[in-house]
Structures are given as structure tokens and as C-alpha cells.
Amino acid sequence: GAIVQRYRDTLLGPDGSLETSSADGAALYRMLVEPAKALIPAGSNVVILSDGVLSELNFETLVVPGPTPHYWIEDATIISAPSLYMLAAAKPDGDGGRKLLLLGNAVSTDPDYPELPQAAIEMRSIEKHFATADEAVFSRQKANPESYLDSKLQQYSYIHFVAHGVASLTDPLDSAIILSPTSDAEDSFKLYARDIIQHPIHARLVTISSCYGGGTRSYAGEGLVGLSWAFLRAGAHNVIGALWEVSDDSTPELMDTLYRRLEEGSPPSQALRQAKLALLHSQGSFRNPFYWAPFQIYTGL
């Protein structure tokens, strides 16, 4: 457990690079991946079911040792699943059309959830990949829980939230996406996991671009699993969420590439990998795992 936490702490720093993290990353690769390496063909999809401290680790960041050390994401598409039961029950991934439901840039009434500087930019970067007639966009005051719950959810193949998230470590059903308030009620701005599972969806991909704090976006692993589980139970084929703080600057770029790749026909798991690799192969600071590794996809087979 100590090596996982130490490695994660290294990755959480914006300056955490391959050079500064290779020792622990390679040790974890030898421990967790190498024993099964013969069973993993190059370029294959690898599904990870992790628990405990390992659920906080993005396996894509493990370092493949050798003459040219590199992150495992270079060799394989890494997918996560909350449980064997959910993995077995996963529906085949189909295209299912190009309709988008997008909610974000909510109005803040709580200082714990300040407004997000880059939310509007991220939303515009997503909108442009869909025909106007095929998208429903709820922003500012209209980005509220009722707008989601009252939508004809089953018609949307893509659902995307640009909002704060709050995790409940005691009850995953209390995890919530923070939107605009609909009334003076204390929690009218929260879209709870317990409500999400009561409203069936057929989305090919749900993306929870959850944010927390001024200029950073984060989501505790337990809460990510709670919300991912809720959307999967509701009928989503794949869910993308963030494991830790990410830069408010790099996320719009990553999402732009993700949706461009989806538009070009890549399946969600491949599209996310390609978006991450675009940052990893860039020349600036965005190549560090802090910027591309937080986002994880669940059940994208």
C-alpha cells in the first residue's frame, strides 16, 4: 500500500514526469502486470477490477521497464470495471446515434463549490462535435437536477457533465453531481446517485468531468465508483470520470480530442486513450500524468 500511495503522490504533482516516477512505476508494473504479461497480447484491451488502495491507482501510468521505459498506456487500452457482476452484465457497445445531453457551468450558491473558470470553454469544445439539432445544452441556471431528470434521457447516446462532484464515503448513493439550485431547499442543486439509478438511460458514454476547488477538478475514487456504478446501473455502456485533481486548463483540450475521435468512429475506450496519448506526446507540461491520467473509463468493452 505504501508504494501505491507514494507513486500516486508523485503523479499528483504537475511536475511528476517519467523521469521522477519511473522507479516506483516500474516496481508496480513488475508486481501487478508482469506475472500476467504472457496473457496480454500487444495492443489489447485490458480490464482492471481493483479494490482498496489499488482503486486509487491508474494502471495506465505504470512504467514498462526496459531500454526505453514508457507508460503502459503506450502498449494497451486500460479499462476499469466496478465489479465482476457489472462486467458480466455489460451490454455490447453500439453506436446508437449522435445525440448529446450536456449540462454544466452551473450557478454557484455555495462557497464550497465556486464557479468554474473553464466550464464554458469545455462545453463549447464539446458542442461543436454535434449537429445543433442533435444536442440539448443546459448551462447556468438551467443546468440543474430537474433539467436532467425531466429530459427524455433514453434518446441520448452521449451525456456529459461539467460540474463539481461530491463523494460520500459512507453511502455511495449519497454521491452527487453539483448543479444549479432549483429551489431554496438545502440540497436542490445536487443530482444524487440514488436519483440517477431511477432514470433509465441508453447512453453509449456518460462523462463526469467533475470539478472541485478553484481551478482544479477532482473526485475521490470511492465517489467515482459510486457515480459510475449509478450510471452503469441506469443503463450506460461506458462512464468516464476523474480519479484526482486535474488541471482546469488541460481538460477542455482532452475532451475536444475525445469527442473528435468519437466523431471519427473510435469506440469510447480507444477515443479516451487517443486523447490521453495526444497530451502525453505533446511538447509542453501537459505530457505529465497529472494532466492526462486522472480520467478513467469504466466497462468500455
Model-predicted regions and their roles:
Residues 42-45, 98, 132-133, 154-158, ...:
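Loop/turn elements at helix/coil->beta-strand transitions in domains of secreted/extracellular proteins
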Residues 56-59, 65, 88, 111-112, ...:
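Short helix/loop capping segments that flank catalytic or ligand/cofactor-binding pockets
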Residues 49-52, 103-107, 141, 161-165, ...:
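Active-site-proximal beta-strand/loop segments in catalytic clefts of secreted hydrolases
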Residues 46-48, 103, 126, 159, ...:
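Residue-level detector of buried hydrophobic side-chain packing
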Residues 84, 90, 157-257:
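Catalytic cores of nucleophile-dependent amide-cleaving enzymes
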Residues 1-45, 64-141, 250-259:
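Peri-functional-center coupling elements
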Residues 18, 22-23, 110, 115-174, ...:
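Functional beta-strand-loop-alpha-helix junction segments that form "active/interaction loops"
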Residues 250-301:
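An often Trp-containing, charged/polar helix-loop segment at the C-terminal end
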